[in-house]
Regions:
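Soluble catalytic regions of large protease machineries
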Residues: 1-189
């Protein structure tokens, strides 16, 4: 949505397609790319990014760091964990992290986190450059309806950018109706 919520100028929420407790590095990398989409779009359209995607950047940094330090998803550092996180179990949040590694390893962790984020940022930029016509179509639709969800958004993004969108009955609905069905993409296990 482009409707402001608190300090946020817009809002993106991802709901899982299916319940899964296991995530792969490629799933996390795709999530990084998606979260950096707003930042990359601002750079593409306005020439520089604003403070708008600051929460997205926090999220990306947190995920990339966890990939390296908690889940052993770094080719360079291998399947190891770094640091011990103290959690407040009843509140469900972390309160402190004990560092149990050297300054050299800390630098390698930072390098890996930076690499993951930079690769995701470049993927986001390239995707938006390649699909700029669809990006512009999405912007135009959001300016009219303010919020898009699930299947409608998926169909809009997979529609032909040259076809008119939205349909003429848009004014009578809160959200643009879905375009013709696109072929389903295979799902990851």
């Amino acid at each position: 949505t482009i409707v402001s919520r608190g300090m946020a100028g817009g809002y993106t929420r991802f709901l899982p397609d299916e319940e899964t407790h296991y995530r792969t590095p490629s799933m996390f990398k795709d999530q990084l790319v998606s979260a950096l989409g707003g930042h990359a779009a601002e750079e593409l359209i306005f020439g520089e990014a604003s403070t708008g995607p600051s929460n997205d950047i926090e999220q990306v940094t947190r995920i990339a760091r966890a990939m390296v330090t908690r889940w052993g998803m770094s080719d360079r550092l291998g399947p190891r964990t770094f640091g011990k996180t103290e959690e407040m179990v009843f509140l469900g949040r972390e309160i402190a992290e004990t560092r149990n590694y050297s300054e050299k390893i800390a630098e390698e962790i930072d390098d890996e986190v930076r690499r993951l984020i930079e690769e995701a940022q470049e993927r986001a930029r390239q995707m938006l450059r390649d699909k700029r016509d669809i990006l512009e179509k999405l912007v135009n639709v959001l300016m009219e309806v303010e919020t898009l969800e699930g299947e409608t958004l998926t169909r809009l993004l997979s529609s032909d950018p040259k076809e008119p969108w939205p349909p003429t009955d848009l004014e009578s609905k809160n959200q643009a109706p879905p375009p013709p069905a696109a072929e389903e993409q295979p799902r990851r296990p």
